[in-house]
C-alpha cells in the first residue's frame, strides 16, 4: 500500500442488528481515516547500550505489508516490539499539536516521533477499538492492542516522564 490511502473499516458484527447473511452482505466498509505517512527503520544503537528501531523514516513509494510488519522495518527488542500482534504501530497525527504545545522546540515531536509505522489522520484512540478491521489498499489489518509506552520514549524526547504522560493523556497509539 502507499501513503494517502483511505483507511476503511468494516463495522464489527456486534454492531449488526440482524445476523442474517443477507443483511451482513449489505454492510459496506466506511472510510474512517487517512494514512498520511508510512515509516520504517532498521534498529540502530540508541541509549543505555540498547538498540531501537524508533527512528523511523518516511517511505516514498509502495511497500509490502506482511503478517509481522512492513518490508524493511525492524525492531530493537523483539521481546516487547514487533510480531503478529504488534506488526504496525499507528499514531494519530493530530496528537503532535498537543505535544508541541507542551514541549515547544523539541524537534522529535513531529510525525514519526513516537516510532509509528503509520501516521494516521482522522481517528485516534477514542474511536479505534480492539478488533477493528482496517483495509488499507490491498492489505487488511486488525487492531490488536493499545501501545504500552516504554522508557525509550523518555530517552528519545529527553523528557524523563514522557512515557507516563503519554499514558496519562491517553495518546499512546495502537497496534
What are the residue ranges of the model-derived segments?
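Short, Lys/Arg-enriched N-terminal segments with co-localized hydrophobic residues
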Residues: 13-27
